[in-house]
UniProtKB/Swiss-Prot annotation:
It catalyses: N(6)-dimethylallyladenosine(37) in tRNA + (sulfur carrier)-SH + AH2 + 2 S-adenosyl-L-methionine = 2-methylsulfanyl-N(6)-dimethylallyladenosine(37) in tRNA + (sulfur carrier)-H + 5'-deoxyadenosine + L-methionine + A + S-adenosyl-L-homocysteine + 2 H(+). Its cofactor is [4Fe-4S] cluster. The lineage of its organism: Bacteria, Bacillati, Actinomycetota, Actinomycetes, Mycobacteriales. Catalyzes the methylthiolation of N6-(dimethylallyl)adenosine (i(6)A), leading to the formation of 2-methylthio-N6-(dimethylallyl)adenosine (ms(2)i(6)A) at position 37 in tRNAs that read codons beginning with uridine. This is tRNA-2-methylthio-N(6)-dimethylallyladenosine synthase. Gene3D superfamilies: Methylthiotransferase, N-terminal domain (3.40.50.12160), tm_1862 like domain (3.80.30.20). It is found in: Cytoplasm.
Length: 529
């Protein structure tokens, strides 16, 4: 009798789902791809591991742009090796650009890895994990071209209030320092209706802000994933008609979505930046007054060697036209120091363009030699000491400009979308963080808004996803400070969702079996039967 009851209890217990963790390296594209990986795994029955807990499946979504990305990945894989030996049932998967580049080399350097999948194989991850577990052998799947636009895949979004929306994947440019086109393939664009439908789905779940993603958003319209010629052969991109006004039209269409309060995009290419985009930014109220436009170098000679297809004069002209149309626009950029053959004169040209551009901030990088790129074989590779010294001078100039630009914000009233986990805050002041419409990070005092009656102030605690207005009281190079009382506080559905721990979901399921929940294991009771 006891044995029968015990067995019935064991059978009644639900199976324990396997847990997962996704570790992301690199750009916003990878961050969004990781949301898709999470969505796929959850649709297949896995559940996210608790913070600090060891996951049954660890997925690395990798970057191949810089050398330290390689070192970071293989270092982390080495740290997991002892656990893999002691817990052979746990699984390790490596995906993303580095997996696409290194392929079988991942298994040679880390033979304890279970799955290696490429940038075009995101949707295969749950199946590959199950196959590796069943066959007890590593699985490698690297496709050479995009077969299905990844935004059709389910995605478990990280934020309740802001979402990434891909408008294209791949790149048709041939920058000599960049390995991305060889890993992500030629550009393939989504149809506007598909993009807008995904945005609407996010807004319906309370999302207030979207960022449109593409390697070169200005080239949007060069091809469309739904074009029949691309379905037959993805290499046919050159023969697909292009709508050069498609991106500006897409921005304006975003302006017609009720409830969508903020639209951002990244990254445009200066060579294809057209005035219709500037006009759309200026005339569409929910398009944020912010522009991130990579410069890379201020030297025309180096830009030519980089194959960047524009020169410093054109770049500065775009900035002038943006600021004429949108006076309060915050402009940010990417810069590379120490490209092969860069002379002191070339570097000074970069400093001159940076000084003239008055960037709000800049992502600055020391040139990193990447095997497989034309720049890796160029003569004139610079000594590390020279690159480091120039890098420091560039940092000092941009830090001064960033501080001056932020100091000019003191006294202004800004609308903030309250965020979570943004930057360093002073715990003693209990500040929260938010992003202004121009993208600046603001640490603010979360005191009750002046327009709120006392009876509501306890209820109206500020939450990530809410919208507040406040006055800037201080500045640093990388953030603003607002220590006065809030002027207004608007509770939002995004704030409700964040407080409830809800995450937006997009994409469609693929009919993947629920492999994350294995058959129930035998239960040992207190009677040890």
């Amino acid at each position: 009798m006891t044995s029968t009851v015990t067995q019935q209890a064991a059978n009644a217990l639900p199976p324990v789902a396997r847990t997962y963790q996704v570790r992301t390296y690199g750009c916003q594209m990878n961050v969004h791809d990781s949301e898709r990986l999470a969505g796929l795994l959850e649709d297949a029955g896995y559940r996210r591991a608790a913070d600090g807990a060891d996951a049954d499946v660890v997925v690395f979504n990798t970057c191949a742009v810089r050398e330290n990305a390689d070192n970071k990945l293989y270092g982390n894989l080495s740290h997991l090796a002892p656990r893999k030996r002691s817990e052979p049932q746990m699984q390790i998967a490596v995906g993303g650009c580095l997996a696409q580049k290194d392929r079988d080399a991942v298994l040679r350097r880390a033979p304890w890895v279970d799955v290696v999948f490429g940038t075009h194989n995101i949707g295969s991850l749950p199946t590959l994990l199950e196959r590796a577990r069943h066959n007890r052998a590593a699985q490698v799947e690297i496709a050479e071209a995009l077969q299905e636009f990844p935004s059709t895949l389910p995605a478990a979004r990280e934020s309740a209030y802001a979402g990434w929306v891909s408008i294209s994947v791949g790149c048709n440019n041939t920058c000599t320092f960049c390995i991305v086109p060889s890993l992500r393939g030629k550009e393939v664009d989504r149809r506007p209706g598909d993009v807008l439908a995904e945005i609407q789905t996010l807004v319906d779940q309370g999302v207030l802000e979207v960022t449109l993603l593409g390697q070169n958003v200005n080239a949007y319209g060069v091809s469309f994933a739904a074009d029949e010629r691309l379905r037959e052969d993805p290499r046919m991109w050159q023969s697909v008609p292009r709508n050069r006004g498609a991106f500006a039209e897409l921005l304006r269409a975003c302006g017609r979505i009720d409830g969508l309060e903020r639209v951002r995009f990244t990254s445009p290419h200066p060579a294809e930046f057209t005035d219709d985009v500037i006009e759309a930014m200026a005339e569409t109220p929910n398009v944020c007054p912010a522009l991130h436009m990579p410069l890379q170098s201020g030297s025309d000679r180096i830009l030519r060697a980089m194959r960047r297809s524009y020169r410093a004069e054109k770049y500065l002209g775009i900035i002038d036209r943006v600021r004429a149309a949108i006076p309060d626009a915050a402009i940010t950029t990417d810069l590379i120091v120490g490209f092969p053959g860069e002379t002191e004169e070339d570097f000074q040209a970069t400093l001159d363009v940076v000084a003239a551009s008055r960037f709000s901030s800049a992502f600055t990088f020391q040139y990193s030699k990447r095997p497989g790129t034309p720049a890796a074989d160029m003569p004139g590779q610079l000594p590390k000491a020279v690159v480091s010294e120039r890098y420091q001078r560039l940092i000092e100039l941009q830090e001064r400009i960033s501080l001056e630009e932020n100091q000019a914000q003191v006294g202004r009233t800004l609308e903030l979308l309250v965020a979570t986990g943004e930057g360093r805050k002073d715990a003693a002041t209990a500040r929260l963080s938010g992003r202004a419409r121009d993208g600046r990070l603001v640490h603010f005092a979360p005191g009750a808004a002046a327009d709120e009656p006392l009876a509501r102030r306890a209820f109206d605690q500020v939450r990530p996803g809410d919208v507040v207005t406040t006055t800037v009281t201080g500045a640093a190079p990388h953030h603003l400070i607002a220590d006065g009382a809030l002027l207004t506080h608007r509770r939002t559905r995004a704030g409700d969702a964040h407080a409830a721990g809800l995450r937006p979901r997009t994409g469609v399921g693929l009919g993947i079996p629920g492999v994350g929940a294995p058959a129930p294991a035998p239960v040992t009771t207190g009677c040890a039967l």
